[in-house]
Amino acid sequence: MSKVATRFAPSPTGALHIGGVRTALFNWLFSKNQKGTFHLRIEDTDKERSKEEHKIQIIKSLKWIGIEHDGEEYIQSQKVEDHIKIANELLKKGSAYKCYCSTKEIEEQKKRARQKKLPYIYNRKWRDADEKDAPKGIKPVIRFKSKIEGNSKLKDLVQGDVEIENNTIEDFIILRNDGTPTYNLSATVDDHQMGMTHIIRGDDHKINTFKQIQIYQAMGWDVPEFAHIPLIHTIEGKKLSKRDNASTLDDYSKIGIMPDALRNYLLRLGWSYQDKEIFTLDESIEHFNLEGIGKSPSKLDMSRILSMNEHYIKTIDEKDLYQCLKEYCKIYKEEIQDDKETKIKSSLSFLKNKAKTLEDI
């Protein structure tokens, strides 16, 4: 059996979302529990929005909460030629085809689907057509030839057995008409080349998983295990988005939430072990498993985060608390001067009993 290998694959287009942090945490904990490796892949193929400073901030944010990846970062944009090569291999195998539908044709198909109140699925016009009939002046996309008959089943390590009718999966694009690969192709090729054994991600990726499994099968590659974790919702029960307040890791560190407290909270957000609430880092690694992840969305509750943070402030060793406070002030307030250090340290035993955040202190 292969050594367990997991990954977290953010796009460097902005600050790290709290949902992404939990996904990274679950991947990291699972790999450590299984004595495996955890890898970071930077999905930076969106050249307009991807920024080096965002990549640096993502790595810093993960490190802040205690997550460090093994080896070098895997940079997706450096592997584009590999993705294109696989698209062409699929074409040669007969597992993909060139589609010459114009933008206008596709829009008309989508319009008809909307009128009938049906989900849009490409009509597979060019699936079995002769390329000799290809119109001039149109650059084709390459589409994967998805299964049409029967059902596909997935043994999801969190959700259980999941089944889908194959005719609901369209012949999805793997190479755009400008020659650039799409997400489902790139992610599959990268995961294969990186030797990933377990793909742990949000359950909004379930349909992508069925598409990606077909690419694995068409290429004759080993298919990894998949686990889809429920998304995080707001306290009102709506899907948490980047537009919500306190949706990024920076939002929490800025108000004085301690990394250990936030990590403990995110661990318990959708995962449980007996009736235990507080976990040290070592305990988290020892007890974490995929069986403990629930199937329903979890609600992000700020009052519980503050309560967890208050517990850590009150119980942490005062030397460690001072170091956290010193680092917090250096980044968000003003650096603590040496002549104030003794006074602050002597006051911590009193101040920590009145505080829920480092900002309160």
Give residue ranges: language-model regions:
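Catalytic adenosine-cofactor/nucleotide-binding cores of aminoacyl-tRNA synthetases and other
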Residues: I207, M219-I361
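Active-site cores that bind ATP or allylic diphosphates and position pyrophosphate for catalysis
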Residues: K93, Y97-H228, H233-L240, T248, ...
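Short, structured secondary-structure boundary patches
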Residues: Q57-I65, L91-S95, Q115-W126, D244-T248, ...
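Short, histidine-centered active-site or binding-site loop motifs used for metal coordination
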Residues: F8-P12, I42-D44, V189, Q193, ...
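Conserved S/T- and glycine-rich ATP-binding loop of Class I adenylate-forming
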Residues: L90, F144, I305
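N-terminal Rossmann-like or analogous alpha/beta NTP/dinucleotide-binding catalytic cores
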Residues: M1-Q115, I207-W221, A261
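Catalytic cores of large soluble enzymes that bind and process phosphate-bearing ligands
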Residues: S50, I75-K79, K98, K145-S146, ...
